[in-house]
Curated annotation (Swiss-Prot):
Its EC number is 6.3.5.-. Keywords: ATP-binding, Ligase, Nucleotide-binding, Protein biosynthesis. GO terms for molecular function: asparaginyl-tRNA synthase (glutamine-hydrolyzing) activity; ATP binding; glutaminyl-tRNA synthase (glutamine-hydrolyzing) activity. The gene is gatC. One of its GO terms (biological process) is glutaminyl-tRNAGln biosynthesis via transamidation. It catalyses: L-glutamyl-tRNA(Gln) + L-glutamine + ATP + H2O = L-glutaminyl-tRNA(Gln) + L-glutamate + ADP + phosphate + H(+); L-aspartyl-tRNA(Asn) + L-glutamine + ATP + H2O = L-asparaginyl-tRNA(Asn) + L-glutamate + ADP + phosphate + 2 H(+). Heterotrimer of A, B and C subunits. Belongs to the GatC family. This is Aspartyl/glutamyl-tRNA(Asn/Gln) amidotransferase subunit C. PANTHER family: GLUTAMYL-TRNA(GLN) AMIDOTRANSFERASE SUBUNIT C, MITOCHONDRIAL. InterPro entries: Asp/Glu-ADT_sf_sub_c, GatC. Gene3D superfamilies: Glu-tRNAGln amidotransferase C subunit, N-terminal domain. It comes from the Bacteria.
Length: 98
């Protein structure tokens, strides 16, 4: 069973640029040891007859039928716009004056 030492936890904190208190080091040491133990249990499972998979549930993408439709006219597209001019949307200037 792998166990993380306090020195390893401090080193991980240094790598992540995180200052850890003694209390946090102790808590993280326990948490990481539990995680490592759980990983070891999963690795012990007999998987010789199980094929590798990325997802245990088969995924199928639902795509709507690609049916051509009549597009909006320019007038219909700009009809709901707060401001339009000459068939184009008008938006407030977001960049400074040039």
């Amino acid at each position: 069973m792998p166990t993380f030492t306090k020195e390893e936890i401090v080193h991980l904190g240094d790598l992540a640029r995180i200052a850890l208190t003694d209390e946090e080091i102790t808590r993280l040491q326990g948490d990481l040891n539990v995680i490592a133990e759980s990983i070891n249990k999963v690795q012990e499972v007999a998987t010789d007859d199980v094929e590798p998979t990325a997802n245990p549930v088969p995924l199928e993408a639902y795509l709507r039928p690609d049916v051509p439709e009549t597009p909006l006219t320019q007038a219909e597209a700009t009809a709901g716009a707060p401001v339009s001019e000459a068939g184009m949307f008008v938006a407030p200037r977001i960049l400074g004056q040039e």
